[in-house]
Amino acid sequence: MTEDRNFDDIAHKFAKNIYGSDKGEIRQVIVWEDLEQLLSQLDTQKVPLHILDAGGGLAQMSQKIARLGHRVTLCDLSSEMLQLAEQDIANNGLLEQYRLVHSPVQTIQEHLDKPVDLVLFHAVMEWLAEPKPALQNLLAQVRPGGMVSVMFYNYHGLVYKNAVCGNIPHVLEDMPHRKRFKLQPQKGLLPEEVYQWIEESGFEICGKSGIRCFSDYIGNMKNMGEYQYEDLVALERKFCRQEPYLSLGRYIHVWAKKKQ
């Protein structure tokens, strides 16, 4: 990837296809369970907390946190996505707790007057030309004792998905970019590299989850055993924090605490 992806051209389609789907619902269920655990580890004496939702799209997760009484700075490269987020936040009666900033994550420090308590950085790195420095810059904005929540498109999940779909030559060719898939990231990140970047920035990893460890690999329903959507969610919740399933998730969510 030669430049960062801006979703101005497909913001409405992105919102519908990503957030308004079963896949999006599974993602929110798992990540919110993690965030509840994360928030319990933050200093609850400090209320409200200041959250940075970096590249936050429609701010689905940070709105859940805002409902608990906390303040959020939401930034995004896409002005169209920010407008959609503002409408959604206003509809939910949370606009007073938000500050919306039209900015890439790489320069968000210019809009912050002090370190934040928590950074959310979800499903952004796989769309960036240089994900490592972007992540490192955001980690630098967290106060000592603060937390970070990072979700990224998993390279191992991308390999496995292509293999089970029979796209074996594509995998053997190292999965070159295919322009026709606008809503699907074309490159995954290696989990071990992302973990290293976080730890090198002075953070201790507190937990990890695989997002959609099973649902994306299930084939044609006509040839499958019978189950309900609720069963699938229960399966994901049961195994998403256990290896080897965790490392086969289409996304991986990792959260960490900055050392004092």
Question: Whereabouts are the PLM-identified features?
Answer:
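A C-terminal cap/extension of S-adenosyl-L-methionine-dependent methyltransferases
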Residues: G207-Q260
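Short alpha-helix
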Residues: P185-G202, K208
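A conserved beta-strand element that flanks and buttresses the S-adenosyl-L-methionine
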Residues: L120
